[in-house]
């Protein structure tokens, strides 16, 4: 049955209401590793959730987050489109049926292949049945699935997410816009047009401080992933543009390889986020 994609929601007006949460990599280099301490830090700083990453730790992490009224906003979830038997961790079914049921979690799938080069649509024939099955499973339990654009992975561009969303053709399946990976591939060109392209399918967004402009294309991660209060890329403008197009989902904070202690990075980034919220209301 064909499904017409609808915008993700009505424009929010003059407020930035999206939930804000850090990626799991905010803690993996220089932060607490225990879920109790992680959840406590996030609650103390005012975040609204966290990203799930380690499937072994996810049940305990979710328990600690839920105790503090925080959410598992997204789960960074690998899918091998070449596999005929077990393309992804089967525990996701049990988790969705139990502690993640009807929480609205978004499974952000990073897609891998050794048979197909990045962005090769010839891999669609292998990927689409896998993604439909995962999407249908998620739908049964109130969850969504978004293609995570990641440089050098099979689905590396936002166009891959858009193409797959059209072909998978499920209401709870869409695309992610990960700022650092988009900048690395496209260098920040034609932002408004690219947001128009992805808006009907947009289910997940991540931001960070970053170098902006044409120099961003092909830049290293130290330039493209910084604390949110640094970098030349205009995140406030970006947030205005995605919310103007109806995006009401969570905003993730990309923190890969940031060398600052987790508390310092997250404190600074939360301060920048609150500044964005204040500037939204002032305009």
Give the ranges of each region predicted by the language model.
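Bacterial N-terminal signal peptides
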Residues: 1-7
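Histidine-acidic metal/acid-base catalytic patches
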Residues: 12-22, 33-36, 132-136, 142, ...
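Acidic-and-aromatic substrate-binding clefts and catalytic sites of carbohydrate-active enzymes
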Residues: 27-34, 49-61, 79-91, 115-119, ...
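Residue-level detector of anion-binding/catalytic polar loops
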Residues: 48-49, 71, 106, 144, ...
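Conserved beta-strand positions in the central sheet of alpha/beta enzyme cores
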Residues: 51, 74, 108, 146, ...
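Surface-exposed, polar/charged faces of alpha-helical domains
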Residues: 59-60, 129, 193
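Active-site acidic/histidine proton-transfer and metal-coordination neighborhood
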Residues: 85-175
């Amino acid at each position: 049955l064909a499904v017409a994609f609808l915008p993700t929601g009505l424009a929010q007006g003059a407020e930035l209401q999206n939930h804000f949460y850090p990626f799991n990599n905010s803690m993996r280099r220089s932060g607490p590793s225990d879920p109790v301490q992680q959840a406590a830090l996030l609650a103390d700083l005012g975040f609204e959730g966290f990203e799930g990453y380690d499937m072994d730790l996810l049940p305990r992490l979710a328990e600690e987050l839920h105790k503090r009224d925080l959410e598992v906003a997204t789960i960074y979830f690998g899918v091998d489109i070449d596999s005929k038997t077990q393309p992804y961790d089967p525990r996701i079914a049990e988790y969705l049926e139990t502690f993640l049921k009807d929480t609205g979690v978004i499974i952000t799938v990073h897609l891998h292949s050794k048979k197909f080069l990045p962005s090769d649509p010839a891999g669609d024939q292998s990927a689409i049945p896998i993604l439909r099955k995962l999407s249908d499973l998620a739908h049964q339990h109130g969850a969504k699935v978004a293609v995570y654009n990641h440089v050098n992975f099979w689905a590396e561009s936002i166009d891959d997410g858009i193409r797959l969303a059209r072909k998978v053709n499920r209401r709870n399946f869409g695309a992610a816009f990960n700022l650092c990976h988009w900048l690395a591939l496209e260098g920040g060109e034609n932002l408004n047009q690219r947001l128009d392209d992805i808006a009907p399918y947009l289910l997940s967004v991540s931001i960070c401080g970053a170098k902006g402009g044409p120099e961003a294309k092909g830049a290293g991660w130290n330039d493209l992933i910084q604390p949110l209060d640094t970098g030349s890329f205009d995140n406030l403008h970006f947030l205005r543009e995605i919310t103007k197009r109806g995006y009401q989902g969570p905003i993730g904070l990309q923190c890969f390889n940031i060398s600052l202690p987790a508390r310092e990075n997250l404190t600074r980034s939360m301060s920048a986020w609150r500044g964005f919220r204040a500037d939204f209301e002032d305009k």
